[in-house]
Amino acid sequence: MKSFFVVFAIVFQATLVALSLAADADDGQCINTTAVVEYFNPFIQECCPNEEPPSRDCVTCGLKGAGLVVTEDGKEMFDFDKYRRKLRGRIIRNERLIYRSLRECCRRRLCEAEPTFTCFHDKVKEQCPGDRTTSLLRSPLKDLPLRSPSC
């Protein structure tokens, strides 16, 4: 369960980094990371309004606030159906391929987080080699220049 939170904290912290790359947002990317961050940032800021960059705990709290982390049978699971709905309107290109990748990686409504996210981001990288979000996810957290977008 701890690795669950670590993976998602890294995912969303890496997404925050993508804001600094906004000038290149359409350079091979498939997912508009700026739009994704704009959606999740209020939930994260509600948990930790003065923390920059937001800690893993703040990001985890934000995911719970957004309704993406749910508890089932005592285990915390990631709701990929809800994540798919949140991606609507935030995909720049290859929309069908992105949704197909999500379905291939998670065939149920709730899936274990770490293997599903690894699968999804590997598939996105294959389809969108210029997508910086997936490249950032492979970087060690300590090497990322994390910052929170201004509200």
Curated annotation (Swiss-Prot):
An annotated GO cellular component: extracellular region
Subcellular location: Secreted
Transmembrane segments: none
Entry comment on modification after translation: Contains 5 disulfide bonds.
Cleaved signal peptide residues: 1-22
Family, per entry: Belongs to the scoloptoxin-17 family.
Protein name per Swiss-Prot or TrEMBL: U-scoloptoxin(17)-Er2a
Organism: Ethmostigmus rubripes
